[in-house]
Amino acid sequence: SFFLIPINQLNAQSLDSIKTENVTFKSEGVSLAGIIYIPKKPQAAVVIVHGSDQVPRMIKFAELLSKNNILVLTYDKRGVGESDGVYAGPEVGTNNISRDNLNLLAKDASAAVNTIHKENKNLPIGLVGFSQAGWIIPIAANKNKLIEFMVLFSAPTVTTLEQLRFQFYTDGRTDFWENHT
């Protein structure tokens, strides 16, 4: 299904009128920490899914969405910030883009969706993310039927194997971008 909320058509509200709730939820035995932004009249709900970097919850993006009547859960990636677990880094050659890691991160996103669903069962729920989330979000959406839509920014257009080959090829080559752009 397709769901679109034109932000310019919504009545933006001040951040002061948005309720926030710190949450922790479990995924595969690990406790993940985040915050839910709850506008007065939410039209939809989203979970923000991380890219590959070691980044905590995305507060500014969550605030922007919530000011436009979207309920948002943003959480610290596993092993980052207040979340437990082990972070698998984006360095070349790590298991960051392995099938096991991407499925694990998809389970984390799915657990976040289940947490939002408990907050408000009547809203359409989606996932929004950047970069590596372009692999994670479709996996989660395929396995969790509560997910009704996906928004992907700067998402990968190649397989993880092709991405890994590219990383190995360009790693340490300071002249790569000068010669190939």
Task: Describe these PLM feature segments.
Residues 151-181:
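Accessory cap/linker subdomain of secreted extracellular hydrolases
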Residues 43-51:
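Short beta-strand element of the alpha/beta-hydrolase
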Residues 65-89:
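Conserved alpha/beta-hydrolase
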Residues 134-144:
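Short glycine-enriched nucleophile-adjacent loop
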Residues 95-118:
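Alpha/beta-hydrolase active-site loop
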Residues 120-131:
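Alpha/beta-hydrolase fold nucleophile elbow
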Residues 51-63, 77:
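The serine-hydrolase catalytic nucleophile loop
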Residues 13-39:
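N-terminal cap/lid segment of alpha/beta-hydrolase-fold proteins
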